[in-house]
Amino acid sequence: MHRSWILGMAFAGVAAASGCGGDYILTVPDQVAPAGGETVTVVRLQRNDFFVLAPAVEEAAMRFRIGDGPLRAAYTDNLGYAAAAVSVPEKPGRHTMTVAHLDMQGDEAERDCDVYVWDPSRPVVAVDMDCLPGLWLGSSEDAAKALRHLVVGANLLYLTRQSVRHHRAAHETLTKAGYPVGPILTWQREHWHIVRDGPYKLPRVVVEGRLVSQLPEVRKVFPHLATGVCDSALAAKAFAEAGLSVVMVGKAAADVSTELRRRESWSDLAAQGP
């Protein structure tokens, strides 16, 4: 069975009514998984008790479900993290996962996240979202056209250095600017691994504070992730270190160990392709 790894940490906002202990903050990331496989979903539950402070909620029961699929559950650890392996549908497409918690006082935190189910034999293109025009300044017309051409026969994922709390709004901005749909991942995420302990050797996810690149793990699940599109030397270096060929838009200097193809502009990329 294939397994996908946590992809990004999209801030999900306050997800419950106010109670005596404050509001819940439930963080649920975008998910990407191979069709018919499973996604190991890592979420975090906090409580907004002291204005900007948000202490972790420990030993909270979390429920995970995609549509009418099997229900999975896990308890949060001392950092507020909980993880569960959730089976995804056989049919590729964008599905919805619901993550929820109900406490003893009747306060509930619930969030939906997008689950992108992909055919692992299909090509995947990665794009540095931070270089796209139209999200902050400039016109998105040429860049959006170029990316729409890229996703003909391929899947697309976005990578960003932005704070995770902006990912949900970024999805809306991308859509309004005419860019194709795809999961938003942070360039790096917390490192985590699975251990088996206790008398029954049940699997448990341990989340560590150190950050690691997402791309190598994504490539293990989707081996046809082969191309990265960007306009900066830093992003080009990250793509090359993960073994991707680089398509550089513009004239920024770049020294990479993999194939480098240059396009003078987004309109040039739209006309020539990658």
Where are these regions (language model features)?
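Second-shell loop/turn segments in exported
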Residues: L132-L137, Y158-R161, Y200-R204
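Short, acidic loop-to-helix structural element flanking the phosphoryl-transfer center
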Residues: L135-L157, V164-H171, G209
